[in-house]
Amino acid sequence: MLTIELNMYHSVALGAFLFWLGGVITDKVSLLSRYCIPAPLVGGLCFSILNCILYSMGITSINFDATLQTVFMIMFFTTVGFTVSIPALLKGGKAVILCLAISIVMIPLQNFLGGGVMALFGRDPLLGIGCGSIALVGGPGTAAAFGPDLEAAGVVGGSVVSIAAATFGLVAGSLMGGPTAKRLIEKHDLRPAPVTAGGTTPSSALATDVASEDERFISDSPRFVKGFMLLLLAVGIGNQVSVWLTALTGLTFPAYIGAMLVAVVVRNVMDGVHVSYPAEEIDTMGNMFLSIFLAMALAGLKLWELIDLAMPMVICLVLQCVVMFLFSYFVVFNVMGRNYDAAVMTAGFIGFAMGATSNAMANMQVVTKKYGPSPVAYFAIPMVGGMFIDFFNAVLIAANIGWWT
């Protein structure tokens, strides 16, 4: 089989093309836009399906370089930090605690569901944990980390199972989040909270699609340069902040968490000393970074790993989707306040509890693009999905493995 290796330049060029392709398809297929399916997801999945077909026929396999994909992800989260003011941080405090509590409940729920299904089929219950929070709440990184632990506990193919389930979760989380939020918003006739004079909200330019002609703003080159330099400053300092936090606490703080926190400080210092802040320019750059990152991430999915799943795994993953929808629709939405912010956070919760924080942000942004901003959701979801939940997930995974052995 011919193997095609795309370097980081080829990969980012392909991601740009797939974003445009996804935009054309979503414009032509009303069902996709009606249910808030992001354009990068559509374009990326089109390519990953093609890649899967070529791989299955033994023709070729296409591999991506994720170097720039990671950079774009960090840059995007930095722009999210720049949208947050101190009042928004204080307002998001309760939301962060509640969202974290709900997420902690979801972890054993996923694991016991997976383990129970596998036990019913006469399989090792630990295989179900590989289809549970290891892959879903944890995502591909946690799946790669805990897969060998499952194999050490006697589960044959634990790594492959976990990574394949995580791949499924990325797709499912992206597909489920937008439509669920749409249903909640329209059923309860929800609207964004009015913006106070001192508050800030993420602008529509942070949505998944590039700004339309109705979202124009007046700018110039110096303002874009100033915004980009602020981003680079926050990314550089934030990376070191993440290193320090990891060393001090023993927890793993991703680079984008530090960058996001530094961006919050820079933004509020600039506002406090009344220095001009290029809000629209940074928001527009955030839109670009997210769009290309998500297209590249989806294009790189190895969908053929799903084809090789045994029937119990398929049933387990389908049930995980059903339980996730029911839990999000009836529990997350109600606990978080039954308002517009709660609906947006429901989309984000599905994204990171089924896949990754990047999926959560994409889900929320495609919803807020259509219905309006949600500052609380924009701060709470990345903080829970990117900073806190990995620690609790690791502890509960270890406890659940001990339960089934």
What is each model feature region?
Residues 116-123, 166-208, 330-340, 385-405:
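Juxtamembrane and boundary regions of transmembrane helices in multi-pass small-molecule transporters
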Residues 3-17, 63-76, 126-133, 250-262, ...:
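Structural signature of hydrophobic alpha-helical transmembrane segments
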Residues 20-33, 79-91, 180, 265-279, ...:
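C-terminal ends of transmembrane helices
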Residues 85-115, 167, 299-329:
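Entry/N-cap segments of selected transmembrane alpha helices
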Residues 25-41, 53-54, 58, 62, ...:
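Flexible hinge motifs at transmembrane-helix junctions and intramembrane kinks/re-entrant loops
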Residues 113, 117-157, 161, 168, ...:
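Alpha-helical membrane segments and immediately flanking helix-loop junctions
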